[in-house]
């Protein structure tokens, strides 16, 4: 935000022990004696699992038009709601998630809370410490009674190859057993092709003996395809066609979209997500009709084949989408609702009030910053979306949802509730499409939350949740769901943690596709700085990525620091940019205890008063050296004044940061505080920084810097 604090709203800087606020309604239904009313299950006698044989078609849980109350008296939480009509007691097996946190026991009296009225939404903000969780079973659905078994107007057309059936229904137990061994050991050679400005690399496990068929818009459900065709009449081509084909073939994908203005990929994965939900639902309804017909034949005494139809998971949710902010979630939900073609959209007004905002960062900030932090940048949310033939419901309970949209922070607070008895993760047991969008923003928040979500993804549930085991796919029962889970990762640029989501943490038998942007000396960020400034790249030796941090620190304290003042023409105005916060703390402690440098450090946890004071002292020369973290620059985008020499402890992950920091020297030159012939930039790097270097110097220069005979390279 602006240094003067003139911005209406600061982007949240989530700490690693983030305490957050939730938006909730205080309208909670209670009975006469003040106790919380318990919600009924509706058709409970048909939903409880009392045997493992096939149940009748009427107990099917994927359904049609809903007969629910509209949520006027619901407890509204940004996570989810349980909706029901009449209320009655239920036992513990009927408990399902209806809120984010359990921090107070239900037997404790309600504590007074501080309230902040939101006039537009009619809601109140309550600190999470005062939030009481209410675990109830999913809403009283009567969908199966009103839903036609097969939507005849929604059949696929021009589809010669059913990728959904091939990926989820056809794999046998023997095949999955072989696949579980091959995906962790041997993959076929990667094939590469160049499309537009990307190198597309495709890898498949050795067990995959069938080449994928090129798929396009024609293989998508008609109701989804019609919406797309109306909005995008021109034919999809190039990298977009390749990306859609990879999604529809259920391959795992890593796609750097390079620029914040590129948003079309979100249209594609939103369309893919709702298409998967509809195909799953129609597959179940068709099989239910077959089972019903077989039962009728049996009652008439006619012979029939007792065939199994395994088409379900342990729980209903099939798509999980992780996003960094509520504004990002708002945009994706709008896309999904658009492609669903739903005539009715429940709780849309509440959703808009809690997720949408017109706040924008000041125009003095870079465009990518303004895009990342526009609107509601709250990073604490979870939302369930449920779809029927004609309606869409927001804030559905997790166990009755088809799609779950959440921030990693919001979801992690559910998965690892402080009260172990009340932790919930069963709703993630049957996720088949896992999407991480704006991964670079999420990494800047706290990547540990993403790793936590992966820990619980496709984990065998603790409870049955009224599952019909005669319909559950065998690879779910055999704990092989990760083998078919599709992982889609979208980022502005790649980093090792982001890349690992597809390269090592995805074992999808459908294969994986990596899209790598082509950077050259002409389109790299260095070529766009517009400042003829000496830029020195200093390589240090590092034998492995695991030892890189230690080798970097030793090189810095043994080679860089001792010659820091002697190698520069200025004794002040030295800015040290440090990508890692942990390296920053280590360097700060070393310089304070083992050197006599006059320095200060500012980071993402510094108070506003310290940020202002140290930057002013740096300008005046009272502070000779200023340590500056990458995460602080991400959240604040300061234009540091008084910079005469720039030392980068590591290569910036975001190439735009390199350009912005170098221009800090340009600003000093313009103000005649520094001489362009005396100032310089020095970057420490190792061979393991090759990918980040490509974005700065270009793909043709990076290999030379990493493996050349010289250890120092200079550019102007």
UniProtKB/Swiss-Prot annotation:
UniProt key word Ion transport: no
Chain intervals with Acidic residues compositional bias: 63-75, 121-131, 140-158
GO BP annotations listed: maturation of SSU-rRNA from tricistronic rRNA transcript (SSU-rRNA, 5.8S rRNA, LSU-rRNA)
Main location as per UniProt: nucleus
Pfam families xrefs: Utp25_C (PF06862), UTP25_NTPase-like (PF22916)
One Gene Ontology molecular-function label: U3 snoRNA binding
Subunit structure as annotated in this protein's UniProt entry: Component of the ribosomal small subunit (SSU) processome composed of at least 40 protein subunits and snoRNA U3.
Family according to the record: Belongs to the UTP25 family.
Listed name of the protein: U3 small nucleolar RNA-associated protein 25
Gene responsible for this protein: UTP25
């Amino acid at each position: 935000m602006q240094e003067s604090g003139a911005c209406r709203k600061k982007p949240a800087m989530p700490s690693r022990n983030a305490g957050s606020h939730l938006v909730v309604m205080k309208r909670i239904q209670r009975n006469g004696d003040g106790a919380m009313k318990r919600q009924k299950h509706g058709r409970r006698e048909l939903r409880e699992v009392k045997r493992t044989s096939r149940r009748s078609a009427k107990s099917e849980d994927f359904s049609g038009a809903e007969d629910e109350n509209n949520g006027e008296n619901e407890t509204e939480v940004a996570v989810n709601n349980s909706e029901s009509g009449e209320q009655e007691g239920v036992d513990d097996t009927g408990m399902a998630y209806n809120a984010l946190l359990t921090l107070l026991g239900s037997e404790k009296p309600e504590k007074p809370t501080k309230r902040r009225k939101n006039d537009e939404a009619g809601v109140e903000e309550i600190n999470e410490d005062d939030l009481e969780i209410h675990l109830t079973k999913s809403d009283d659905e009567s969908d199966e009674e009103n839903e036609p078994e097969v939507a005849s107007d929604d059949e696929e057309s021009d589809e010669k190859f059913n990728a959904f059936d091939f990926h989820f229904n056809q794999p046998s137990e023997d095949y999955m057993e072989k696949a579980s061994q091959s995906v962790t050991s041997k993959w076929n050679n990667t094939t590469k092709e160049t499309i537009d400005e990307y190198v597309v690399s495709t890898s498949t496990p050795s067990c995959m003996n069938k080449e994928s068929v090129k798929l396009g818009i024609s293989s998508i459900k008609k109701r989804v395809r019609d919406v797309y065709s109306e909005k995008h009449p021109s034919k999809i081509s190039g990298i977009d066609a390749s990306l859609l084909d990879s999604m529809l073939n259920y391959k795992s994908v890593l796609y750097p979209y390079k620029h914040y203005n590129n948003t079309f990929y979100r249209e594609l994965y939103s369309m893919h997500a709702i298409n998967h939900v509809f195909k799953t639902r129609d597959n179940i309804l068709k099989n239910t009709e077959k089972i019903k017909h077989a039962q009728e034949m049996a009652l008439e005494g006619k012979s029939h084949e007792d065939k199994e139809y395994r088409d379900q998971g342990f729980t209903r949710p099939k798509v999980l989408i992780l996003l960094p902010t509520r504004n990002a979630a708002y945009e994706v939900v709008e896309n999904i609702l658009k492609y669903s073609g739903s005539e009715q959209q429940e709780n849309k007004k509440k959703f808009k009030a809690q997720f949408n905002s017109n706040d924008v960062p000041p125009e003095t900030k870079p465009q990518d910053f303004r895009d990342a932090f526009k609107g509601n940048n709250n990073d604490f949310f979870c939302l369930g979306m449920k779809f029927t033939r004609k309606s869409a419901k927001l804030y559905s309970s997790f166990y009755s949802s088809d799609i779950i949209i959440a921030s990693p922070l919001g979801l992690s607070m559910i998965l690892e509730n402080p009260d172990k008895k009340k932790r919930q993760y069963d709703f993630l047991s049957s996720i088949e499409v896992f999407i991480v969008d704006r991964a670079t923003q999420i990494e800047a928040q706290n990547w540990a939350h993403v790793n936590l979500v992966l820990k619980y993804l496709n984990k065998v549930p603790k409870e049955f949740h009224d599952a019909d085991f005669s319909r559950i796919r065998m690879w779910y029962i055999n704990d092989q769901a990760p083998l078919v889970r599709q992982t889609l990762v979208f980022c502005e640029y790649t980093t090792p943690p982001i890349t690992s989501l597809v390269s090592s943490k995805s074992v999808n038998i459908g294969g994986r596709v990596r899209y790598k942007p082509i950077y050259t000396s002409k389109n790299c960020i260095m070529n766009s700085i517009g400042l003829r400034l000496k830029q020195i790249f200093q390589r240090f030796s590092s034998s492995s990525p695991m030892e890189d941090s230690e080798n970097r620190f030793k090189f810095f304290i043994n080679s860089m620091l001792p010659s820091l003042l002697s190698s520069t023409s200025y004794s002040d105005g030295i800015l040290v940019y440090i990508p890692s916060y942990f390296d920053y703390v280590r360097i700060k402690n070393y310089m304070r205890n083992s050197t006599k440098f006059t320095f200060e450090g500012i980071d993402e946890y510094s108070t506003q008063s310290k940020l202002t004071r140290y930057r002013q002292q740096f300008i005046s020369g009272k502070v000779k050296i200023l340590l500056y973290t990458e995460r602080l620059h991400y959240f604040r985008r300061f234009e540091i004044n008084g910079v005469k020499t720039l030392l980068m402890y590591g290569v910036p992950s975001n190439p735009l940061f390199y350009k912005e920091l170098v221009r800090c020297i340009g600003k000093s030159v313009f103000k005649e505080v520094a001489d362009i012939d005396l100032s310089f930039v020095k970057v420490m790097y190792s061979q393991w920084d090759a990918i980040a270097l490509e974005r700065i110097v270009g793909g043709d220069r990076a290999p030379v810097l990493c493996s050349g005979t010289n250890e120092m390279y200079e550019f102007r």
